[in-house]
């Protein structure tokens, strides 16, 4: 069981069994009182109430059937990138905080960030911190191993050398090790 919403001695209580349990419980309660997960991203109206009541008893969704549920921001330009540029000054932690909130409200917990011209961990060092604080597990796409964005290699290509493991093993190993070291305190699924 990930979270339980219940009443104890007349008080509404949200109990959790893991890192995201309280968050999911709060967002479930929010949804039940009329706040759409899309309230910010799609300007979905929030239902207003003069009074709210909670029935005595216990409510839970139980454990999710799939452990990692998430999205991949693919082909981010021009749509997503332009929107982020206009709203937040770029694809950065401010933009990702809204994406992460939407994901959590939809009970998602796994994210592959934008990759065309982005370096999630380097463009804004707050991005991985916010992901971790919010309980989002980070991953990378199939061609971005060891938590290294492709653009991280592109920006270092002159110092790293060829993307060829048969001739450049030492430099590529060091590049990958640095990515793992940088992200070791965060919750990641490594490709």
Tell where the protein language model's regions lie, with residue ranges.
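Contiguous, structured surface segment used for ligand recognition
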Residues: 1-63
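Aromatic-lined carbohydrate-binding surfaces of glycoside hydrolases
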Residues: 45, 65-191
């Amino acid at each position: 069981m990930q979270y339980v919403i219940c009443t104890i001695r007349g008080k509404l209580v949200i109990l959790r069994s893991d890192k995201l349990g309280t968050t999911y419980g709060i967002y479930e309660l929010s949804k039940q009182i009329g706040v759409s997960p899309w309230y910010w991203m799609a300007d979905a109206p929030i239902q207003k109430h003069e009074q709210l009541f909670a029935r005595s008893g216990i409510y839970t969704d139980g454990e999710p059937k799939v452990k990692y549920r998430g999205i991949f921001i693919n082909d981010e330009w021009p749509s997503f990138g332009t929107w982020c540029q206009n709203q937040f000054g770029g694809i950065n932690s401010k933009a990702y905080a809204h994406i992460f909130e939407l994901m959590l409200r939809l009970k998602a917990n796994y994210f592959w960030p934008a990759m065309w011209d982005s370096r999630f961990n380097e463009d804004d060092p707050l991005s991985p911190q916010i992901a971790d604080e919010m309980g989002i597990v980070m991953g990378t796409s199939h061609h971005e191993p060891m938590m290294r964005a492709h653009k991280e290699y592109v920006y270092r290509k002159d110092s790293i050398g060829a993307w060829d493991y048969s001739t450049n093993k030492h430099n590529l190993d060091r590049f990958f090790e640095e990515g793992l070291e940088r992200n070791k305190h965060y919750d990641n699924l490594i490709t």
